[in-house]
Amino acid sequence: MLRGLLVVLTISAVSPALAQSFSDPEDGALDMSEFIIDYKGFLPVPLLITEPAVGYGGGLGLMFVRNSLRERRQEAGTSGHVTPPDVFGAVVAATENGTKFAAAGGMFSFGDREQWRYRGGIGRADVNLDFYGRGGDLGNGDRSIGFNLDGWAMTHQALLRLADSADFIGLRWVYMDFLVTLDPTRPAPALAPLTRTLTSSGIGPTLEHDSRDNIFTPSRGWQGSLDALFYSPEIGGDEKFQTYRAHAFAYTPFAQAFVLGTRLDARAARGEVPFYQLPFVDVRGVPKGRYQDNNAAVAELELRWNATPRWALIGFFGAGKAWGSEKFGDANTVFAGGAGFRYLIARRLGIYMGADVARGPEETAFYLQVGSAWR
């Protein structure tokens, strides 16, 4: 839904009359609040991909919003909680390194007082990536080896709110069936054979908390979860392994115009883990999958300065580490940081959009952002 804002900007550029209808009556600035709150129906969504791991690319999505945020806010008078609108969508995209994918999914709430939530989707992918080895060591002297994943993946998650709290418990299922092909010109003995079909199927519990004041660009509160997935041949997979994640994103306002965001994020994997499912250091400025091992952890700070009622500047800095093949103290620490800007594109909803430039150990990366950069 958030990326649907991009298509609104495109329409506004070619239709002055329509652009005028997106003017905020309070300050006359460009604002999409009414469009997002009242919009129902199918919405085409152009996408721009800027992830360094796959290169620049683009695509097109189609989003359907079944109920408006205004209706959800009215329902909050009964339930005591503002439930996100039910959203369904589909997307096709491609990037400059030959990666292609198509996916469809959605999220919706149901049950008495909207106590239940569902999130899920299914996708077909043909993805080209690089593997740098556990702890950066392939075992053959090469810096990295290219590989391709071609197949299907899907995930389903159901969450139940605990009483009238901001806490949820749930169950999640992840299924992946890929033909995995390694670059035949650069053999990696530890990853042989060069081509194989590998199926992963995992089920596990989730404990989640969400007290953010805004699900898009929060200014106070925190969101976090404890997740575990247990993969096994007994539920349709080829290998037996486990993955774990614990994360917390906290937002603290101070001095009226500033918001400090704090992120702690740790992941682990045990057992016969496929190399492409190993945890990795996930921070802006570092390509996804560049630093992988059995364990990975990240700490990140982000400071937002609301310089005007509409415009904000941000600065961020993070550090991460992947370890397991080496002891924690011996593994390299990866640092990355950068700066960006935001525009309050939907004042009534608190949605910011903008761009970041980040520098990691090896390269500088550019990111488009709608809402929070943390997932």
Predicted regions, residues:
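Bacterial N-terminal signal peptides
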Residues: 4-13
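Sec/Tat signal peptide C-region and signal peptidase I cleavage site
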Residues: 15-19
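Gram-negative/organellar outer-membrane beta-barrel architecture
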Residues: 34-42, 50-195, 199, 352, ...
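Transmembrane beta-strand segments that form the barrel wall of outer-membrane beta-barrel proteins
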Residues: 41-50, 83-96, 102-104, 222-234, ...
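Hydrophobic, lipid-facing positions within transmembrane beta-strands of outer-membrane proteins
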Residues: 42, 58-60, 100-104, 150-156, ...
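Flexible, surface-exposed loop regions and adjacent strand-edge segments
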Residues: 135-141, 185-193, 243-244, 267, ...
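C-terminal outer-membrane beta-barrel translocator/porin domains of Gram-negative envelope proteins
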Residues: 193-196, 201-324
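Predominantly the C-terminal beta-signal and adjacent terminal strand-loop region
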Residues: 207, 264, 327-334, 344-375
